[in-house]
């Protein structure tokens, strides 16, 4: 018989920097999960990633106080800002363009995000990422 699920917890935690302080501690503590066990497992799983890169994680909490977690790819906005060398996007993306990205850069981001996107192929994924870039005030070259 499968374990009874008591809930899901969605968090964004910097890679390799999970610790018991908020938001991790209170979110796991409410469900009675072992906070340090999660922190050690998450930090070990994100060891090969760029330190500090926010990683979305979905934690499944079970009735016997055990848990599993699934890591997603970093948010597209973070990857776009990193590729363009920006701290933040435009406050008015229609009139104030803050950077420029090429199709090659968008393809690289789309390949990174592919497991989490519902796009049918790489071209559709690139168009999805290009839309996110435009909404942040970035000019996109080579994508219609």
UniProtKB/Swiss-Prot annotation:
Gene behind the chain: rplK
PANTHER family tied to this protein: 60S RIBOSOMAL PROTEIN L12 (PTHR11661), LARGE RIBOSOMAL SUBUNIT PROTEIN UL11M (PTHR11661:SF1)
PROSITE patterns for the chain: RIBOSOMAL_L11 (PS00359)
SUPFAM superfamilies: Ribosomal L11/L12e N-terminal domain, Ribosomal protein L11, C-terminal domain
Family: Belongs to the universal ribosomal protein uL11 family.
Pfam families referenced in this protein's UniProt entry, alphabetically: Ribosomal_L11, Ribosomal_L11_N
Keywords recorded for this protein, A-Z: Methylation, Ribonucleoprotein, Ribosomal protein, RNA-binding, rRNA-binding
Subunit note: Part of the ribosomal stalk of the 50S ribosomal subunit. Interacts with L10 and the large rRNA to form the base of the stalk. L10 forms an elongated spine to which L12 dimers bind in a sequential fashion forming a multimeric L10(L12)X complex.
Taxonomic lineage: Bacteria, Pseudomonadati, Pseudomonadota, Betaproteobacteria, Neisseriales
Organism: Neisseria gonorrhoeae (strain ATCC 700825 / FA 1090)
Gene Ontology cellular component annotations, sorted alphabetically: cytosolic large ribosomal subunit
Keyword RNA-binding: yes
Superkingdom assignment: Bacteria
UniProt name for this protein: Large ribosomal subunit protein uL11
Single GO MF descriptor: structural constituent of ribosome
Post-translational events: One or more lysine residues are methylated.
GO biological process: translation
Record function comment: Forms part of the ribosomal stalk which helps the ribosome interact with GTP-bound translation factors.
């Amino acid at each position: 018989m499968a374990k009874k699920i008591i809930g899901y917890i969605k968090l964004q935690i910097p890679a390799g920097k999970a610790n018991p302080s908020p938001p991790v501690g209170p979110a796991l503590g409410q469900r009675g999960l072992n906070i340090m066990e999660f922190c050690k497992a998450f930090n070990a799983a994100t060891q090969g990633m760029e330190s500090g890169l926010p990683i979305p994680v979905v934690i499944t909490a079970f009735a016997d106080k055990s848990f599993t977690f699934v890591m997603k790819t970093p948010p597209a906005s973070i990857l776009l800002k990193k590729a363009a060398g920006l701290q933040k996007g435009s406050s008015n993306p229609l009139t104030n363009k803050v950077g420029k990205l090429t199709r090659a850069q968008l393809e690289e981001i789309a390949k990174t995000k592919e497991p989490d996107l519902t796009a049918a192929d790489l071209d559709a994924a690139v168009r999805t990422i290009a839309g996110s870039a435009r909404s942040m005030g970035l000019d996109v070259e080579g994508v219609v």
